[in-house]
Amino acid sequence: MKKIVKVILKLLIIIALIIGGIFAYKKYMEYLEEERIKNAIIKIDFITPLEIEYNKEIKLSDLIISINGELIDDFKIDTSIVGEKEINFKYINEENIKVPYKFKLNIVDKTQPILWLSDVYSVNVGTTKKLEELIMCGDDYDDNPTCIVTGEYDLSKIGSYNLTMEAIDFSGNKTTKDFLLKVVKPKSSSSSSTISFSYLYNQYKSDNTLIGIDVSKWQGDIDFEKIKEAGVEFVFIKLGGQNGIDGDYYIDPKFERNIEGFKSVNIPVGLYFYSYANSVSKAKEDALWVVDQIKGYEIDLPIAFDWENWSKFNSFHISFNNLTKAAGEFINTLKSNGYDGMLYSSKNYLEKIWLKNNYSTWLAHYTSNTDYEGTFKCWQRTSSAKIPGITVNTVDFDICYK
């Protein structure tokens, strides 16, 4: 028995020595590697100044003029937050040493705020809101740019006033605009001319297009059979929206009738939701509400994020970047629940407000031939179409591309 114990002890000692030796060898090799790295030749020339515009798409290699080796990973750099950012990377130098390196990158916002203001701005006499509330003033990064109107004016009296408006963002970028304020009598609304659906259909129907309409309560009780006979190939139906910022959700009074009616005549259905989201989290809430309302319905086409509160934009306290992210959150939340989403907006806002994105787009541009240069899936051509089956008001005419 004693002999067995001695043998076991010897084996344990041998094992301990082997493990200790391996550990010591590993530490020694780590030391050698640290020394190699410490003494490695590093030759890297960066762009000067090491400064990049906010939200610009760049890779690590875009910042390097020359390097004595090859990058292990030429990764994309996140430039979504203004300020100083530490960048860490590794590369194999000319001695075949894997060298870690870090540097500071300054991310800056040099884009001026936007004042949605022409040379002449008209308001109705008796308007109680301040001009700073009425005139759209926004920024790509700053949720709350400073917006000031200078000069004397009186909204309770008809007249003309020479004024200046200034917008300053978080980074000190400034936009200044001189304009003529006209305080005028309210004008009576005049009816606009209409265009027959059949004329538009013949003009825009091709092998590459589908012709449709979008509807809400404003189209009243629709005769779906007549709509089908007129040649409508798809429809976007208003599901509902929200009663202002943080207001209650509502379902369009004609939604149920419309979706069941269009389904009964086999017209493919998409939806749109009128959003008042003032944050990414609110847009997600919007999307989840939408998903909850449409359970049990088969939705054939995308569900559009319809955000067009431009006349009240200043009260939302949201940057163009965060607004664009909000649209993305709405679309991505729909996608995670099995639905396609898209962004609805007009040409001017798509070009000047919404930041670069890869969202499927429903373009609103009321013209015979759009010159919008971005990509779009559908085009809302006019809001003045007349079609058999809708006797209350006109209807929006849409073209979708196959």
Indicate where each model-derived feature is located.
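Aromatic-lined carbohydrate-recognition surfaces of secreted/lumenal glycan-active proteins
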Residues: 334-351
